[in-house]
Amino acid sequence: MIQLEHANVKYGQALALEEISVQVDFHEMVAIVGRNGAGKTTLLKALVGLMPLAAGRRVLGDQDISDLSVESIAKLGVALVPDTRRIFPNLSVHENLKIGSIAHRPGHWTVDRVLEIFPRLQERLGFGGDQLSGGEQQMLSIGRALLGNPRMLLLDEPTEGLAPVIVDQL
């Protein structure tokens, strides 16, 4: 499980999250909903270490990871697919997926498995990332994250730009 305990997160001097405590267990699906600007993205960034904690603790399993870098937290198997698509526009879909598999942790996610759940990417393997629609870029971002075989995958606006049939597959 990953959790924040009595966490404060600041943007400069402004308090963005105050005394927030949240726990998400492995293999649990949780949706965080709220109005724009409520702190949903900030919460996800705090969980993965992209936002430092001004107070409180960040815990993974039974390990305090409050002082670990985002890279160290990623190596422990926590991945975030941000709301802004992170792909390499000058690389092909296949090359983008191969980069995702470099940080490969043992598990069942392979390029072939990703292409099974996102068949549209199979059709676009030779296309550059900048030639993809927004929904295809989102599929590629999620696929790259899955290839790291994370223990925990956090998704920010995961269905943005995806067709309803793809959302159902996810």
Show which residues each predicted segment covers:
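ABC ATPase NBD coupling module
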Residues: 52, 64-85, 111, 123-127
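Catalytic Walker B motif of ABC-type/P-loop ATPase nucleotide-binding domains
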Residues: 153-157
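Helix-to-loop junction immediately C-terminal to a conserved catalytic motif
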Residues: 48
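Conserved ABC ATPase signature
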Residues: 128-132, 136
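The feature captures the beta-strand-to-loop junction immediately N-terminal to the Walker
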Residues: 33-35
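A short, proline-enriched helix->beta-strand linker immediately N-terminal to the Walker B motif
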Residues: 147-151
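ABC ATPase signature
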Residues: 91, 132, 145-146
